[in-house]
Amino acid sequence: MSEPQPRGAERDLYRDTWVRYLGYANEVGEAFRSLVPAAVVWLSYGVASSYVLADAIDKGKKAGEVPSPEAGRSARVTVAVVDTFVWQALASVAIPGFTINRVCAASLYVLGTATRWPLAVRKWTTTALGLLTIPIIIHPIDRSVDFLLDSSLRKLYPTVGKPSSS
């Protein structure tokens, strides 16, 4: 999850608790793709996408509760929702889902050509490799998405209330 919060700081339900793991549901679904029906994988994407949407709505709500002139409130809420949604969609769903999918597909292919293991063993090995890859890819993807957004979308935001990449 994230670094420990300073004393008195508000805990973010979507980033500092077990709820954060719902954002990784699709990676788990991708890891199990060779073993479960496609509907289960799509369901895992539904769970992760619901997490992304809930976090974006929560950040917009919190941005709207900050006391300030009404004129800047709408822009601040919009920036909070868009920034959170885009960041989470890329860092929690799209990029890791694609990465785990390709790792598992490549693993299954290599195991099929390089070994004589039974198909069931190859599928379970592929699933294990996919699951083991998840913790390795999280932080590099998060930092890459921070860099991407800092270099593009976040340059378009108004300077007041600009989200930080940390």
From Swiss-Prot:
- The signal peptide annotation in the UniProt record is none
What compartments host this protein? Mitochondrion inner membrane
Task: Enumerate the InterPro entries for this protein.
Answer: Mitochondrial_18_kDa_protein
Q: Which GO terms describe its cellular component?
A: mitochondrial inner membrane; mitochondrion
Where are the N6-succinyllysine residues found in this chain? K123
Please list the disulfide bridges.
none
Coiled-coil intervals: none
Question: What membrane topology is given?
Answer: Multi-pass membrane protein
Query: Per the entry, what induces it?
Result: Expression is regulated by the phosphatidylinositol (PI) 3-kinase pathway.
Name the domain of life this protein comes from: Eukaryota
- What processes in GO biological process is this protein linked to? apoptotic process; mitochondrial fission
State the similarity comment.
Belongs to the MTFP1 family.
Protein purpose: Involved in the mitochondrial division probably by regulating membrane fission. Loss-of-function induces the release of cytochrome c, which activates the caspase cascade and leads to apoptosis.
Please report the name of this protein according to its UniProt entry. Answer: Mitochondrial fission process protein 1
Question: What gene does this protein come from?
Answer: MTFP1
